[in-house]
């Protein structure tokens, strides 16, 4: 196969690689933080070790409230924005994938890292984009597959950086960026002889500055389509938002207090309407005997209002004003004055996310609520009526909806 682009070469490859050298570790690090946020105590596939690859665990904090919104927004948002740059970088080195590596150990190591790096990053991009769109066509756990591939990526990325960083530095020093940005198409010439440089190039149809502008413009375009997923005021620009830009059932409720994104709808939960109807009650356990409260009794307890975000693993997030009963007040009502943990269960049956386990910090946070209202209005069924959990910095999927039971454990004597 012949590769005849006259602009392909080590300098252009290095220009594409430089921002990836910073951006990809940020995407990887925030992804690992997001996995920690899920917490192994949740006992769901997202938090289990995969092939022995287990992160060190600590209690995910409940402050600042926007922590998970930041880490998940960076992971998904920056990951999507970097896709055009990743593809450009792969295009720039594709001749290397079709040449024999030889028998030199260093060359073999470099080729191995390149193959693993390309394979893992394409896998992560494809599965990540499918997850953002809720399209699980791959037949395996997204959480496990994405997590395992992330470790392959991290190892191959580190190996690739070690072997190629000196080449990148030399290449960047060998040509002036200012000169290249001032070079028009008519004056574009191939780089000096190199395995990436075509020995018999075609006439240029794009300058190097044009290639940089094309990739940069693509990144800006993708950013414009993505930023609205986690910025409430720009949600109307999020053309790729998988759940649409409004969740109102009709035009009369559009822009209302419950018109913000939802992951799992009430219909999708399969809960019988009677289970969350007028006969609904909340059971509190952990004290000497269970305490049962109906919604009127909950509404009669002291109410607390807080503006808190919900952020989901698919990348979208939103901040809303929630009103409800503090978990600490519910713990006292249950007879537990110093709670250590809380287990919150939903009326939904059979879902791995129908149960949420909260650590001490999450349980005793003054803004951790069993919410009854949002933005001054009753919760809609899709948003968890008659009551839902809302905890600062907790992944959205663990802010359990349609809550029926909360069990508190007592703190050990200090």
Where are these regions (language model features)?
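Structured, non-membrane catalytic/scaffold regions adjacent to prosthetic-group chemistry
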Residues: 230-236, 242-414
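Membrane-embedded alpha-helical bundles that constitute the cytochrome b-like, heme-associated redox core
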Residues: 1-246, 260, 385
């Amino acid at each position: 196969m012949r590769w005849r682009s006259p602009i392909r070469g080590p300098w252009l490859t290095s220009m594409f690689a430089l921002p990836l050298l910073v951006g990809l570790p940020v995407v990887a690090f925030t992804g690992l933080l997001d996995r920690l946020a899920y917490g192994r105590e949740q006992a769901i596939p997202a938090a289990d070790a995969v092939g022995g690859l287990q992160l060190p665990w600590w209690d995910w904090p409940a402050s600042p409230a926007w922590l998970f919104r930041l880490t998940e927004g960076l992971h998904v948002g920056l990951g999507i924005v970097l896709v055009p740059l990743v593809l450009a970088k792969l295009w720039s080195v594709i001749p290397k994938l079709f040449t024999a590596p030889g028998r030199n150990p260093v060359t073999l190591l470099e080729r191995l890292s390149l193959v693993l790096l390309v394979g893992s990053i394409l896998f992560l991009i494809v599965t990540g984009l499918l997850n953002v769109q809720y399209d699980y066509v791959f037949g395996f756990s997204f959480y496990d597959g994405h997590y395992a591939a992330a470790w392959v990526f991290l190892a191959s990325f580190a190996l690739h950086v070690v072997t190629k960083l000196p080449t990148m530095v030399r290449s960047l020093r060998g040509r002036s960026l200012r000169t290249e940005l001032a070079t028009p198409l008519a004056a574009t010439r191939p780089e000096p002889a190199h395995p990436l440089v075509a020995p018999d190039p075609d006439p240029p149809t794009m300058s190097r500055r044009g290639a940089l502008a094309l990739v940069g413009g693509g990144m800006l375009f993708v950013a414009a389509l993505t930023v609205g997923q986690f910025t409430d005021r720009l949600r109307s620009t999020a053309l790729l938002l998988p759940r649409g830009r409004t969740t109102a059932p009709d035009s009369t409720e559009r822009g209302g207090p419950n018109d913000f994104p939802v992951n799992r709808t009430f219909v999708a939960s399969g809960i019988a309407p009677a289970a969350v109807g007028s006969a609904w009650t909340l059971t509190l356990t952990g004290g000497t005997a269970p305490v049962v409260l109906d919604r009127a009794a909950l509404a009669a307890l002291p109410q607390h209002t807080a503006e808190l975000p919900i952020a989901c693993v698919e990348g979208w997030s939103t901040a809303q004003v929630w009103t409800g009963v503090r978990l600490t007040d519910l713990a006292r009502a249950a007879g537990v004055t110093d709670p250590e943990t809380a287990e919150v269960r939903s009326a939904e049956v059979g879902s791995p996310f129908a149960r949420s386990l909260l650590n001490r910090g999450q349980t005793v946070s003054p803004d951790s609520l069993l919410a009854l209202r949002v933005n001054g209005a009753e919760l809609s069924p899709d948003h968890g009526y008659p009551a839902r959990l809302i905890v600062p910095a907790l992944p959205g999927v663990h802010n359990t909806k349609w809550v029926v039971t909360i069990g508190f454990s007592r703190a050990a004597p200090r």
